[in-house]
Structure formats: C-alpha cells, structure tokens
Amino acid sequence: MGIRFRVTGAALALTALLAQAASAQDSPQDGKLILPTIDVSSSRLGAGIVGTSTSVITAEDIRRAPAQTLPDILSREPGIQVTNLFGGVNGARSAVDMRGFGAAAGSNTLILIDGRRITDLDLTGVDLASIPRESIERIEITRGNSGVVLYGDGAVGGVINIVTKSAAGSPPSARVETGFGSFKQREGAASAGGSNGPWSASLYGNGVNSDGYRVNNFYRQANGTGDFRYTVPDGSFYLKLSGDGQYIGLPGARRVDPVAGLDQLTTDRTGATTPYDHSQKDGANATAGITRLLAPGAELIVDGGIRYKREQAQFYNATATVATSDPNKAVDTMLTTTSFTPRVKLDSLFGTLPWNAIGGIDYYRAVYGSDRPLYLGAPPIDRYDLTQSSLGLYWQQTLSVLPSTDISAGGRIQRVTVSARDKFDINAPGGQQCFIDFGCFPANVEGLPFDTTETHRAFHLGLDQRFNENIAVFGRWAESFRVPNVDERVGVVTVGNGVPTTFDLRTQRSHDWEAGTRLHFGRLDIQSSIYDMMLTDEIHFRYGPNFEANNINLDPTRRYGNETIASYRVSDELRFKAGAAYTRSVFRQGLFAGNDVPLVSRWTGNAGVSWNIWQKWLVFDGVVRLVGSRRMDNDQTNVQPKIPASTTVDVRLGGEIEKIFWSFAIQNLLNVSYFDYAIASPYPYGPGSQLNTYNAYPLQGRSYMLKVGMTY
C-alpha cells in the first residue's frame, strides 16, 4: 500500500510550497455566482461526434453535486445505471452501465481519460474512485456504438471521456479540503498548479478512510495525479503521471431463503457473510506526448503510455475465525498495458464547405499474469498468462454541407492477437481435493493453449440538421464490437469440473441506430432520442443448475429505448434539471426469447434543483433519483423476485466566504432501505426449488458529509 500514501504525501507537500507563492483568484463581481449554462441547442463542427446523443458534466456540476461519488454523479444522466457491491463507499468498484448491459456493463462502457482508453482487459473494470474529483475539468458522455471508430472495441453502450484540468497559462493557485462523515469517514484533498512562461504543472491528491456501512466494509483509498507541460504556439510536450492505492473489506451478501426461514436483509442488514475477506489494489500510470502544428489546420499528436495494476484478494471459508484462518482461495494479478497512439487532426475547406477529420493508429499491448493460490504467498494452483495485442487504423471525417447541416462518416479496422496459457500445479496447497475412503483428486485441469488472430471492422454515419436557433434533429447508424476480456476467457468452463479451459469465446458484435431532437426555447433546453441496438454473440456469465458457472456467448439480444434530458433556467440563480430513460434489454432468440436481460431497470429518472440562495455565500442543490425494478443477476428465466424500485433524495448546502468554502450534504435523506445488486438462485424449479431465494448487497441508509477548505 506504500505507493498510494507516497503519492498523496507528495501532492500535499507541493501544495504547501506553491501556496506560499499563490495569488488569490478573482471573485465574481459583488459576490454574485451565476449558474453555468447547458448547451443542447446545436451541434458544432468539431464538437463531439455528429449525430450522437451527448451530454457534458462540468467541473461546477461535480463540485456542487450532493452525491459524493463519480458513479452517483454519472447516474443522474439519462440512460446510465449504476451497480454497487461494496456498500457504495466512495463509489469503489461500482459498475457504470450505459444502455442496459447489466452484469457485463464494465466491458460494454468505454472509459477514457483525456481521450485515451483506461478500460482494462479484465473484469475489474475502471475504478472511478481512483480519480481525484478536483482534477476533472468536465465529463463528456457519448451514447451508443459510434465511439468505437475513434476509441476502439468496447464502446458498445457508449463512451465516458473524463477531461482533466491543465495549468497552462494559469496563475499559481492551490486548494486544500478536508471532510468528515458518517461511518467514521474522513477525507482529505489538495491540489496546486500554475505556469511560468511556456512551462506549467498541476498536482492533485486525495485520500479517503471509512469504516463503511457494513461489517468488514472498511475502505482506504489514496490517489495522486500530476500534469506537466511545455506549451508554445505551434506545439506542446506533456507528461501525465498518476498513482492510486486501495484496500477494501469484502463483506459478502445478505441471504434471503424463505424455505430456511432466513432473511438477513431484515434481521442483520449490516452484517457480513465473509467477515475476513479483503482486497488490495495498486496502480501507476504514465503518459507522454507531443503536439505539433504542421500547417494551418493540420495538427499532429504523438503519444504513448504505460499502465500498471496489481490486485490481490484473499477469500476465506465460512468456518474462518480470527484465531484460525481457513483460506478458501486467493488471487494475485498483475496487468501491464502499453500503448502508442499517433494521430492527425485536420480542419480546412472543401471548396467553400468547412470540414474536419481525425485519423490515426492505435497500438495496445496488454500482458496479464494471475496466480490463483489457496492463500496469498503460497505456490499458485493455477497460473494464467495472457498477452493481447491490438493494432487499429481509423479515420473519421465531418463535412458541413450547409451552414445548418453536418454529416459525418468514419471507419475502423482493428487486428487483435491473443495468446493464453494455464499452468496447473497439483502439488500446490489446495491443488488436490481429498475425500475419506475415496482418495485424492486434482482440484482442476490444466487449460489448453490458445492462440488466435482476428480482424474486426466498425463504422459510423451521422447527421445533424439545425432548422433554426430553436430546433435541431440528429441521427446516426453504427457498428461496434467487443473482444472477450481475459477473465471471461479463463471462465469459459466451470472450475473444478474436470474439463480444461479453452479460453475461446467469440467476439461480440453490435449494430445500432439512433434519432433525436434538440430544442432550445428561451430558458428551456431539451434533448431527446430513441435508439435500437441488435447484438450477436453477447458475452455473459451463467450460473446454472448442476453447478455450472461459466462465460458463454448468448443467443441474439436487443436494446432499445428513449432518453430525455431537460433544463429550465428560471434565473441566473435558479435552475431545474430533469432526465428520464426507458431502457429495454431483451433476449430476441433462443431459450429465453422475449425475457429481460437481468440487472437492467426499464424506467429511470431524476429531477434536480440548483439555487443560489444568497449569492455565492449560500447555495443549495438537491436531487431526487428514481430507479425502477429490475431482474436479479442470473434470473434469465424471469421467475425470481425483482430488485425493488427505489427513490432516493440527496441534498447539499454550501457556500464561499472569500477564500473559505464549505458544504454539508445528506445522501439518502429519507433513509430508504434499498439495494441495486442481487443474484438469484439458479434452482427455481423442481424438487428442492429455491424460488424466492437470493443474495443481496444492501446499500447505506441516510448518511452525512461535512467538508471545509481554502483556496490560495
């Protein structure tokens, strides 16, 4: 865990140094704070992907949000649903789902930082808790398949691009903040930045400690990022560094079993099934690049990066005690991803018609090594090694055929090479299973070597038509794909059933279309769209009868729905914002044809208000969020109980007095008892039926957070 504390300590130290020379930033005139505008009235050449449904969350939106985590902030956007397994502490390990992919959400929503993909090829996904909130300039959300051309595989439900701040051209500044909240949560954050001529630097660090809502729900997190730049009129050089560390308790589920008379959601909601399980994750990232203006309207960007992540987890049997450990299994995984992504941006005229384009090459190489011992430090029972390389070539062009009409077209071709191996050691602790009177048997079978090379293609076609300053329409058609991740490949067979893993899954493919409108009438802005997505070979985890537990390619599936977002500005001091989404995720062929895909709510919505009560000295923000009922994980038959619908209210009061700022937030104001993830028993039929039996992961009730800080 050393890296995370060293990174945060360095950030705090630099903050103190820069603060001595920092100058106070200008305050709004007469202390008046004006709410930022929301622009959904037009699509401009070079702003986003033409024809797509997009939205932007600004730094001010993040700072004023009553929600305390990035996943919760994202869940306010129509079409985005969030699943939490660990009590929702700081959003750790939360899955962000765009357009209804349920348990596979993390592999179908592509996460970027500054336009570079950070979604790894394992199932842990992107942990948004590792990103300091204060480092974020804005979050750009692009829905649907169209992001695959620019950013590559995995952009099926959509793309979330987190754009970070730069200190280029800025005076010296610094910010420190501390917070205290429910469940003994303590937070600290610091940032500093500034520039001197062409040189600039900025640092952000934060740390969070919490005991969590449940037993064995403790959480320790520290993050640090740095941005260093040299900028001149015709180019720049930049270096970005980050490090994060996390240590978290894994309390397990609360079981409901009517036959056994068990309802832990009611009798022991905050208890732990696994009071000693825990996980530790450490990561480090570096990106360096140059930009060069080749000619007016022609810019070259050449950058590359390396990401390293190590995760260790220890799991114990139910008989474990403090005095006598009884290990069940452990995981020790290292993943290193290197990338090289040169590209060119062009902006010119075709006759009298403005056009722009972006094209380039993406090269990524990921090396994965995972030991699966009985306990950490022991020789591994299985050692999985996988190397995946991808080389993509893409081009996307936008043309303004009329002052009111933009069209866009793009394509990508990507070659993916995968090599996977499994080494099984029968002599390792836990490598054999022994039974009285029957002898000992291997706990697993060594997997078969796997090597494959595939070529995949994707495209995007888009149109934006602005009829006048009040009404615009947009539409698009796209094809996307998703390559199986390493954990899905490892799990194509049930561990311990005597069948070797083959690592072989088919690549998931998707086609979708979307059409929508943007309306702007005075103080009212509305964006609404409908979409339809057809998928083949969708990758899904199945836990079925006869102790089957493996990843498979599903029969064809479909997503369709509507997403609407609206904002009404009453005045510079008062604004209302609301959103609603209807999301259908269904099997369209096979045994479950017509059934809902689990973990997807059909209806979601939210309404919020931002009110500057007394200029900038006292401001109020409130959000009401509705999440409809959804099928539990593993309930493809659609016969088990649903995860109940929930309505939660979050509120925040805050303000600024010269250099001092403060806030007091309450999450789940009405103290609603709810959960957003549960897994149903695979035995709903026949003798010994476990209908209405499931494991749920409850989320915290009413909680508080008080923060105070200072800017320099």
Show where each model-derived region lies.
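Gram-negative outer-membrane beta-barrel transporters
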Residues: L402-I407, R415, D525, I530-L535, ...
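Membrane-embedded beta-barrel scaffold of Gram-negative outer-membrane proteins
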Residues: E299-N317, R466, A472-A478, R482-P484, ...
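Face-selective signature of the C-terminal outer-membrane beta-barrel domain
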Residues: P233-S242, S279-I436, L448-P449, D464-R466, ...
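Extracytoplasmic beta-strand/coil segments of soluble accessory domains associated
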Residues: S43, P71, S75-D120
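C-terminal beta-signal and adjacent terminal beta-strands/loops
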Residues: L626-D635, G654-Y712
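Short acidic/polar hinge/loop motifs at secondary-structure boundaries
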Residues: R116-G144, I162-V163
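Short, acidic, small-residue-rich periplasmic hinge/interaction motif at the N-terminus
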Residues: Q25-R63, P71, L293
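Transmembrane beta-barrel wall of Gram-negative outer-membrane proteins
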Residues: F180-N209, R214-A253, Y276-A295, L346, ...
